[in-house]
């Protein structure tokens, strides 16, 4: 049984329609799963940073700042970390590492804390260059500690989320 040109054209049109729907959906799903790494990572860091502040004065509430880890943001692909990169005292204090040892990840993370006698604050950042063009996405969660206690501020700052 041979296929007529009209049947072939209809089959090709159906295949093209399915591909036109499936490919962008797949691409969006991949980007969303990568963004989960940043949002869940920052939520973990922020929650553990606030939990660590319980019962402490604002000047001692949060751990010291830790620089961007890894220092070079992964560019265009997920990377496996060097051994010991998450062993800094602050990362241990907030019980965080970007991924299990040997598992690649897309984002670099940082925790900046500022201590003062009455009000202390922190900002935790995540940065990635998912498309490898040299521009980075930025995700941030802010928190503070004062006389009322430590809290995570509502919302998340996001800039260039799919870079």
Located regions from the model:
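Low-complexity, S/T/G/P-rich flexible repeat/linker segments used as non-globular hinges
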Residues: 136-163
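Acidic, glycine-anchored loop motifs typical of Ca2+
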Residues: 129-136
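Short, glycine/small-hydrophobic-rich surface segments
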Residues: 36-44, 49-98
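N-terminal single-pass transmembrane signal-anchor helix
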Residues: 1-30
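Short amphipathic beta-strand and strand-loop transition segments with alternating hydrophobic
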Residues: 106-117
């Amino acid at each position: 049984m041979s296929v007529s040109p009209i049947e072939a054209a209809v089959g090709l049109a159906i295949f093209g329609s399915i591909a036109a729907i499936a490919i962008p959906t797949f691409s969006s799903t991949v980007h969303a799963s990568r963004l989960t790494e940043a949002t869940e990572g920052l939520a973990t860091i922020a929650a553990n940073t606030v939990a660590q502040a319980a019962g402490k004065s604002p000047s001692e509430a949060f751990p010291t700042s830790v620089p961007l880890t890894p220092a070079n943001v992964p560019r265009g692909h997920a990377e496996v970390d060097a051994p010991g990169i998450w062993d800094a005292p602050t990362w241990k204090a907030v019980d965080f590492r970007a991924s299990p040892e040997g598992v690649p990840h897309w984002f670099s993370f940082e925790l900046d804390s500022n201590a003062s006698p009455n009000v202390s604050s922190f900002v935790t950042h995540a940065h990635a260059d998912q498309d490898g063009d040299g521009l980075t996405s930025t995700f941030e969660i802010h928190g503070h500690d004062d006389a009322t206690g430590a809290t995570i501020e509502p919302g998340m700052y996001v800039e260039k989320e799919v870079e």
